[in-house]
């Protein structure tokens, strides 16, 4: 009988235990090499539908498909062995009813091997969350600014700035938590609202543009690394890889055109007979 060894990954219980403790670290990952680099530093790797904009150049996340999420989820699972891997359910894959949500969530988990899925959880999605959790699928909620809803909201803008919006965001948080979400992403809200939600719900909250009042933080990795020429207000750049890549590409192009590359060190030579 053969032995199988398995690296211990972060679990739902590990994430739940972080409530009010050391903040959770989450970053996005869309490919195996990046996942391997981020894996030792993160509690959670999110295969976000942001990949539509970040990797595929789409104008929003609305055009992202199940096939895209599964392909990138598989790649991240090959690169990561310690962090929990969560895959976004794309727009149109869960809204119709709980059965649709279950079938698509099962497909994502079976075909990628991920540990959980994420749903942009307006209050209407509470039924879907409960349905999935009852059937063994861990769900991360997502409230506040919901990128999949930009066509209703009129673009990417912060939420909870009016009393009505504030009440709606709090209701979304309560609904997701009561339905069994093991964690909730709070995006694009003011600090006092993020603090109020974090204090009210029993599950951990992870903020993106929602202040340090949350139980953890997430950023799009490419934003954090400075790969784009525009930086959102809530992002802190920890590198300027756009400049690094631009400089490297320029030097490579110059060397090729001047026939400095490849040089002797990068060129194969015929072996002498007997050597």
Curated annotation (Swiss-Prot):
User: From the record, what ranges are coiled-coil?
Assistant: none
Please state where this protein is localized: Cytoplasm
Q: What is its EC number?
A: 2.1.2.11
Q: Which Pfam families match?
A: Pantoate_transf (PF02548)
Q: Which residues bind 3-methyl-2-oxobutanoate?
A: 49-50, 88, 118
Query: Where is this chain primarily localised?
Result: cytoplasm
| Entry keyword set | Cytoplasm, Magnesium, Metal-binding, Pantothenate biosynthesis, Transferase
What GO molecular function annotations does the UniProt record carry, in alphabetical order? 3-methyl-2-oxobutanoate hydroxymethyltransferase activity; magnesium ion binding
Q: Which Gene3D superfamilies match?
A: Phosphoenolpyruvate-binding domains
Q: In which pathway does it act?
A: Cofactor biosynthesis; (R)-pantothenate biosynthesis; (R)-pantoate from 3-methyl-2-oxobutanoate: step 1/2
User: What top-level branch of life does the organism fall under?
Assistant: Bacteria
Binding residues for Mg(2+):
49, 88, 120
- Essential cofactor(s): Mg(2+)
Query: What is the enzyme's main class?
Result: transferase
- Active site at 187 (proton acceptor)
Annotated InterPro entries: Pantoate_hydroxy_MeTrfase, Pyrv/PenolPyrv_kinase-like_dom, Pyrv_kinase-like_dom_sf
Q: Which reaction does it catalyse?
A: 3-methyl-2-oxobutanoate + (6R)-5,10-methylene-5,6,7,8-tetrahydrofolate + H2O = 2-dehydropantoate + (6S)-5,6,7,8-tetrahydrofolate
Share an example GO biological-process annotation for this protein.
pantothenate biosynthetic process
Q: How is the cofactor bound?
A: Binds 1 Mg(2+) ion per subunit.
Gene Ontology CC annotations of this record: cytoplasm
Function field = Catalyzes the reversible reaction in which hydroxymethyl group from 5,10-methylenetetrahydrofolate is transferred onto alpha-ketoisovalerate to form ketopantoate.
Q: Which NCBIfam families match?
A: panB, PRK00311.1
Complex and partners: Homodecamer; pentamer of dimers.
What's the protein here called? 3-methyl-2-oxobutanoate hydroxymethyltransferase
Source species = Hyphomonas neptunium (strain ATCC 15444)
